[in-house]
Each structure stands twice: as structure tokens, then as C-alpha cells.
Amino acid sequence: MGRNKITIEKISNERNRQATFTKRKNGLIKKAMELSILCDCEIAMIVFSSNNKLFQYSSRDMDKLLIRYTDNTDNTRKNLTNQDYNRVFGNKKSKNDDEDGDDDGDEDLGETPTTPHGNLNAHPIGSMENNNNNNNNNNNNNNNNNNNINNNNNNNNNSHHNNNNGNNNNNNNNNNNNNSNNNSNNNNSNNGNSNNNNNGNNANHNMHHHNGNSANISPMQMSQQANNNNSNNNNNNGNNNSNSNSNNNNNSNGYQQQQQAAQQAVQQAQMAQQMHLQQQQQYQQLQHIQQQQQQQHQQQQQNMGPNGYNHQQQQLQHQSPPPPPQQQQQQMQHSQQQQNMNGIIGHHSPVIVGNGVSLLQPSKWSASPYGEDLAPLTPRSASYKGIYGNQYPPQMQPVVNSNNNSNGNSNSMNNGISSPPINQQNQQNQKPPIMNKPGGGGQPMYYDYNGYPQQQQPPQNYNSNGGYWGQNVSSPPPPQQQQSANPYIQQQQQPQHQSPYYHGNYSPQQQSPVLNSQNGHHSSPMHPHQMHHQQHQHQQHPQMQQQQQQQQQHQQHPQMQQIQQQQHPQMQQHQQHQQQHPQMQQQHMNNHQINHHHLNSSPEINSQKNVHSSPLIMNSNNNNNNNNNNHHGNDNNNNNNNNSNNNNNNNNSNNNNNINNNINSNSNNNSNVNNGNNNNSGKVYNNNNNSNNGNNNNNKPEQTIPVKIEKEHSSSPTIPEQPSINVSTSSNSAHVFNNITSNSNNNNNNNNNNNNNNNNTNNNNNNNNNNNNNNNTNNINSNNNSSNTNVNVINNSSSSSTPPISPANINTQSPAISPALVPVVTSLNPQGEETSKPKFKKSLNLSIVIPEVGNSKYPPPQCKLTPINVEATKQPDIPTLPSPRDFYPEINLHHDNVSLTPNYWGGWHQTPRGSLLLTGNGGSNNSNSSNNNNNNNNNNNNTNNNNISGNGSSSSSSSSTQNPNGFLGCLSPRSFNFLNENNNNNNNNSSSGNNNNNNNNNNNNNNNNNNNNNNNNNNNNNNNNNNSNPDESDQSFNRKRKSMEPKN
């Protein structure tokens, strides 16, 4: 027997409705409370009664829950409506009375996130955990483009601060979207590159001032912000570039909360200022007492004879106030800093004390798992005025991603904060160089009203020999520095051997006198007086050095030290360089990319010993982007410069990695890093141009086999007609994936960034894994070479050192082919014709280049792709090669929404629409990159990889693929953006890539041309001397680019 269930329908009697509501309301709220506790979920329940009374329950603050879970930018979370419940529970009458239907709707309704963090990605006011996750997704997702796609969604969901992450993912979006968009925007954000170069500088500062990255991030989260900054750097570029639209849109979500937080910050900053003034008074009193003591010791010294000075120093080791002129300067600085502090109040930035905790910041802001998004103290606001200076405790040290440097992925340098680099020793325990202190490797800083450093002049008592007047500068080197009671000041005294700081981004050549000095400060190229000063500081008498160090301790109140270091460590140095030696600035910007990532490692990190090449080598745009990217361009660097940096980071990281642009440019140089390597020669190599151009140009004409590609796309207005395309695989260029391995090798930073810059660099190709997949595609042809590099469709036939294709080189059974190895049809040219105007027909003719081996020729493979049918005309009396179908899965290319990756990696993965993303595991990426290293040895095969890695825009000219997305083997309609027009010149065809290759002399042109090439096929085609009509190529590109842009 069972009770009869009440029919779920409206109670007709009004009184009964009132009674039922009263009874069940309390039970409903009780169940909601129990559910929130049992399942550790957040519940906000609002019940409206019939008499307009509001009953609500919330496991946390109601308003924040509503904002977090209701204001979603997209439908990543399944929202159940009343219709869903009615659908499940509305048919109870048809069921038996004995059935227990309580759980009937569990499966039908599906699961919704139950944990408090389940929907963080949907949180518009993204918390640091979201940012970290998205950044990790970006870092991890750089290995996985799918994750990048998800990150795009997640970051878009996280918007606000994940706007930056959104731009991280939009960096991945910029890498992917910008490789999709910035494939129009790599190509366009090659505008972004040029803009990123500008945005690199502008967006650098804009991020410091305008980017809402970390506006709600607590100090303990600041070390986590670096990844966000990497993305946020791109966000700045993205904000400055196309991403700024989404970022601005996303940023609009929590604007009111930010305004409220700003007001709170102003109030609290005023309180902090009052506390600071009180402490300042105490400090002045103490300073006065110390000054009196100093005078007493000086009087004693005068009575002690010629040796009294040294004796005085021994007496003053624990009491060493500064000389009066230096004291006046510091007082002037203090007044400047106090003015800056007044200005900070207007910018809602509280003061951070030596322990890294804000004076204004309640403990709940750091204790809350959500980071309390409205916390007034943020790394962005702090970095805006540089409040935090060097005062973070070891776990919070603002460390610029040295790992990111080569890629320009020091994007985290937006806030100058990043997670500690992997390969750095004790960097967490070391303080960044104090540029505004005599012992910090620099001179006292003077700030203007906005907190930026004014041009520095040596102090009046500054001795040209490196010391101050009255100091013995010719005394022997200092002993071990004295340990002070203040551990943070002690860290400042310790030699700092970390490269991750901003000045480490400049080329070691300019710093060589100072780089490995005892002081260890990798400061930016210095004014000659600074260099003398830094070199002689440690040559002064040991006691003098201790005296100066203690003067720093006594003169600077613990808070004063922070305020004196208000400048963002990177902005501070960046503007010092602009002001001190503008004539050297471009040179440094051209060079520091190559070198900065080598600061803590041997110059042969790329196994290319000339990495520290002459300053002229780096392409100015790439370098400027790198400089902008590395300096603040790192801010831009990641994504729009990862869009740019996809070209630029690829160019920048490709400076060492210069994967797409430079390596495509480098494709001549067998060292993939050849921008860096070419740069190594201290020259911009036309070899890149020659090898790129020469790859196609120098290579002998190869046998082209007309292949008919039948492609089903009834509704693809984006594909113009093109009569046929042939695959030219010949190229000398070092495959991009020396860059991958160069990325992995070039920069362990890039390896750190490899997830970002290897992948971001590969993200130029949208080839995080596509780089690996480009590697994979490269590895596919590596089957030709080492069964690792699958270069373009068949083989790089030209001057590559790799063996030509022969039946023995091809494993028809493909067991040795790793999942990452996927045969790829790379560059497509109109049937070997010099060319006709780019036209795409539904039936495309794919011609496969077969290299000549001796006097014998191997016939083309007969291969069919689904839906691309490749029919190779069989030549009589020639043995046939294995069919590429042996290597291909059934690939359905969806040119409208998504393209699917083959099931090598466990199934089909949806990727953003556009060319097929060949994503793989990081392990396969490593192996692929190693394969690419093999391909690096097999430079020529990898040259096609350059094209492969090149997103068409960054495609190395030698690369056979015209696939702008760099996704070889993906002939989706969107992949043909650059299947154009000057396919004749594969060098030129990758147009942007060719420009890169051609413009390897000018990687700016490579990036700009890649960017402009992507932006303007006219430029690329024109620059590439493509025969295609620039107007038509432009139009076709615009049509393609529009089709490639992700739909909101």
C-alpha cells in the first residue's frame, strides 16, 4: 500500500493555495539549505508568494551569486527552465501510484554544476581561480587547441578579468581565434602585429592603465596573475586590437562593482596615507637621530688620522645614514612618491607593506576562495603606480616570465608578475633589481606626475668613477654582503642572478659588462654612468658597500621602499631605456628577443651558438613586437602579439623560434630558429628570403601530378573558384618545428611558453598542437625523412638534406606513425601554372609534387580524402606509391561550424571552424617537436613545416601548404584563404609566409607582411611578387577572413 500522490496541478481554492504555500515554503527553504551543505553547492532561492511576499534563501551573498550564475556570456551551462521540469514531471498521472517518481527526472534534466567552483568560468567577474584555470587552459590549451577553444569559451565566460584570459583564450583565440581571427588577425592582427608593435608599446601602457585584468585580484593571487597577464598582455593588444571589443564588452559586466571597489579603495587609501604620514614622521625622527650619530662619528674620524675613514666605516656598519646630498635626493624622491601616493588615491590603489599584504586590504579578500572580486587592491592598480615595488615576500615575488622572454611570452610582464620560472634558481627568494637605489644597479629614480620615470641624471655627488664623493671607490671588492635584520631588504642586497626581470629582455651584448657582474642585476642597457656605477659599487670598499646598504635600510621606511619602487619593474626600465638612449632603443628592441631568454642559460640553448647576434638581426617589427612584446609588448606579446606574436612571438619566440614568420623565413636556414640564427650572423639573411624564395625558386621544378579534389560544399560562398592546385613540397627552409623544438629548446622559456609560445608560436598556425601537428604533418613527411617529419604531402624534394621519397621510405602500414603523424597536403598551387587568378571551384585539382630521385620517378599516390577525393593520374610504367588513405581516417571537413580532428587522439574533437586542427597530446607534441628536430636536421622537410606551421600568413614561402591556418591536411573551405593566387611561388604563395621568408631580412615585413599579408594578400601577394591580381587577392582574402572569423 502506498499513499496517493498529490496531483501536481494548480489548487483551485485560494485558501488552500495559501495554506499549502505556507506549509511547503519552509520545507523548500530547508531542503535548499540542506542541499547546499550536503552537496557543497551554492544555492540562491527566491520564492514569490501569492500575496507578493518575497522569501529567499542563499548559501552565500545573494547578489554575488546572481551575478555569477545568471550573467553568462554563452550557454556553457545548461539552464533548466520550468518547461524542462514540466516535461519531466508533467506525466505523473500516467504512472502507477506505487512508483517513486522523485528521481524520475534526474537523467532527463541532466546535471548542472554542483560545486561552488563548477560555474566559475561562467562568472563574468572572473576570479583568479578562473583566470588561473583559463590561463592554465591557455598554457595547457596551447598544447590543446581544443582547450584553447574551450578557453575561448571559458575566458569569454570569465570575461572581465578573464577578458584578459578571454584574450588569453582569445590569446588562444588570438592564437586560435586570432589565428582564426588573426589568421585573419594574425594576418589582421599582424595589423595586430604592427598594431601590436604599436599596441605592444601602447597596449603595454594601456594594460597597465586600462586593462581590467587583475583589478579584483588579491596580492597572494598576483603570482598567479602572470599567466593572466600573458593572456592579458594579449588582451591589451586585444583590447587595442580586435580583442578589445570582446574585452571591453566583457569588461562591462562588473563595471559597477569595480566602481564601488574603486570608491572603497579611495577611502582605504586615505586611511593608509594617514598611517603612512604618521610612520613617516617617526621615520624622520629616526633619520634625524641617525644623522646626529653620523656627525659624531665623522668628528671622531677627523681626529683619527688617515686611517680614520676606514675605521669610521667599521663603526658605521650598523649605523650608516646617507650623506646629506644623497639624503636630500631621497627626500625629494620621497616627496615625489608621496605625490604619487596622492595620485594613487585617485586610482584606488592602496599601499602594500613589506609582507606583501595591503594595509588597506581586509583579510577576507585574500581568504575568500573567490578572491573577492571587488577587492580594491589589484596588481593592475598596483602596477599602474608600481606600488608593490619589490616588497612582495618570496612566494609573491613579481617575476617576469623569463621563460616567456624569447617568445615574447613574457606577456605576464603586463603586471610584471608571473609564476616563478621553472629553470631559475631561487628566483622566488630573490628580489627584482632596485633600480632607484644606489645599490640596486641603477640611479635614484625621478618620477613625473603620472608616476613614470623621468630622465635620470646622476646625483650631484655622484662620482664618475662609480661612487659618491667622499667614498673610496678604489678599494678592493666587497666581501659577503652583510645580512640585515629585514629579510626583504636582505634579499635586495643579495646578488640577483635571475633573468626573468624586465631588463633581462635586452640583449646580453649590450649588458655584457654588467650582466654577470657580482651584483647580478640584469638591468637594461645602461647609461655609461650607470654602468660605471654598477660595476664599481661592488668594487668599493667592503665596508662602504655595507654602509650604503645600511643607508638604504635606514633611509627607507619599509613602506617608503615600496613607494620608491612604484614603477612597474618593466615599465620603469622600459622608459629608462627610451629616455636614456633612444638611439640604442631600436637596436635593443631588435636584439633582446634573441638574447633575453638566454640570460640564465648558455647561449647555445638553440644549439646555435650565435644566438646572441648583432642587434641588427631581428626584424624590427618582430623585434619591436618582441620588444613591445617583451617589454610591454609582452603584454601585447602573448596574443595579439601572439596573434602578432603568433607571428611575432612566433617571430619573437621565433626570433629564437621565429617559427612561422621567421622560421618560414628561417626555412632557408636549417636552424629553424633562423631568425635568431640568421640573426646570429648579425645580419638579416636574405638566405631566409633566398631559402624561402630560393626554396621554391632555387629548387628544381618538381614533377607535379594533377589531382582532382572533389569537395562537397553546397553552401560555401567563402570559397572562390580556383581551377586547380598543385602541391609543391620543395623547400630548403628549416622547418618551423625546429622552432617547436626550438621553442622547446630555444626557450625553455618557450617551453614554458611552449605551451604558450611554442604553442602560441604554433598558435600562429593555430598549431599549438598544429605546430606539433604541423610537426605532425611535418612528421608525416618525416616518414619520408625519419618517419617523424611528414613534411608536405609527399616530400620536400628540393635542396633538403632529407632523403627523397622512395617506397622504402614510406611505411604503408603506418604502425610506426605516431598519432601526431598525419599525412598532410600542404601547399596548393594552380596545377603548376605560373598562375591564374585565384579561383576556387567546387572541384579542386590537387597536384602532388613528387621529388625526382636520380633518374627514376615515383608515381604519385592515389589518394581519396573524404569529402576530398584526390585522384592522381597514374603514369604508365611507374610503380605506384601506397595510397594516402592508409594514413588518413575518414575526415569530414565541416567548413561552416567546426572541423573535426581525426581519431588518432581518441576521437573527434570539435575545433573552431576553419581548417582542421590536428591536436595531439603534449607528449606527442614533444616527440613531434623532436621529430621536428629530426626535421630540423632534415631542414628542408621542415621547411614545408614552416609552411605548415605558417598559418598561410606566417607560412614559410617554401612551405608547400597554402593553408593559411597552417593546418595541413585540412582542406576545409576556410583553409583556402591563401590557397591563392601566387601558389606558383610557394615562397610567395604562403604570401605572408613568403613575405616572412622574403622578408626575413625584414621580419617586420614578415610579420607585417604576414600580418599585412594576412591583412592584405595584396601586400603578401604583392610583396611576394605573386602574379595574382592584388585586388582580387585582397577581395578573396576578405571573403575568406570573414568566413574564418568565429561567430559570437
Swiss-Prot record:
Residues 74-263, 294-339, 386-812, 916-1048 are annotated as: Disordered. Residues 130-205, 212-263, 294-303, 327-339, 393-437, 446-466, 481-500, 540-593, 619-699, 738-802, 924-960, 982-1029 have a biased composition (Low complexity). Residues 1-61 form the MADS-box domain. Keywords: Coiled coil, Differentiation, DNA-binding, Nucleus, Transcription, Transcription regulation. It is found in: Nucleus. One of its GO terms (biological process) is regulation of gene expression. Pfam families: SRF-TF. InterPro entries: MEF2-like_N, TF_MADSbox, TF_MADSbox_sf. Residues 529-539 have a biased composition (Basic residues). Residues 249-304 form a coiled coil. Disruption phenotype: Leads to slower growth when feeded on bacteria, fewer slugs with lower migration, decreased spore production, reduced cell differentiation, and slightly abnormal prestalk differentiation. Residues 97-110 have a biased composition (Acidic residues). Residues 74-85, 506-522, 600-618, 715-736 have a biased composition (Polar residues). GO terms for molecular function: DNA-binding transcription factor activity, RNA polymerase II-specific; protein dimerization activity; RNA polymerase II cis-regulatory region sequence-specific DNA binding. GO terms for cellular component: nucleus. Induction: Induced during development in prespore cells. Transcription factor that regulates cell differentiation during development. Seems to negatively regulate prestalk gene expression and positively regulate prespore gene expression. This is Transcription factor mef2A. The gene is mef2A.
